[in-house]
Design a protein with these regions (language model features):
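A contiguous, surface-oriented mixed alpha/beta subdomain in the mid-to-C-terminal portion of proteins
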Residues: 1-107, 120-121
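Short, low-order "capping/linker" segments at domain edges
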Residues: 114-124
């Protein structure tokens, strides 16, 4: 199992290095969230790596909220209820419209790990 895990982490790390997130901004130019889209479904495996957290720490802090509505999309934002409530209906629609849906859960990712903390259908 350890050998499999080590190889998976190496693969996930190489995948995250190949993506360029698109930063979605509000009308004042402030970053609201990041959008990652990739044809490589292995991109989803990168969310629990240090490199993933490092990629977003400067813009969103050390506590990230991550939504994975389908196998080719990852949404990342700071742990902010108001920001999530602004976009959760659109994010949930991405899940509903997906050919390959993954999850409607909101995940907290930080140095301690990854946890499902809620659902896009519930209030935060």
């Amino acid at each position: 199992w350890k050998e499999f895990r080590d190889k998976a982490l190496i693969n996930a790390t190489s995948v995250i290095k190949s993506v360029k997130p698109e930063y979605i901004k509000d009308s004042t130019g402030k970053i609201e969230y990041a959008l990652i889209q990739s044809d490589n479904p292995a991109i989803v495996s990168s969310v629990n790596t240090q490199q993933f957290r490092d990629l977003f720490k400067e813009n969103f802090g050390s506590d990230l909220w991550v939504i994975i509505p389908n196998r080719s999309t990852i949404l990342v934002m700071s742990a902010d209820k108001n920001r999530l409530n602004t976009y959760k209906k659109a994010f949930y629609q991405m899940f509903l419209d997906a050919i390959y849906p993954v999850s409607r859960e909101v995940f907290l990712i930080n140095s301690k790990g990854l946890w499902a903390i809620g659902d896009l259908k519930t209030s935060f």
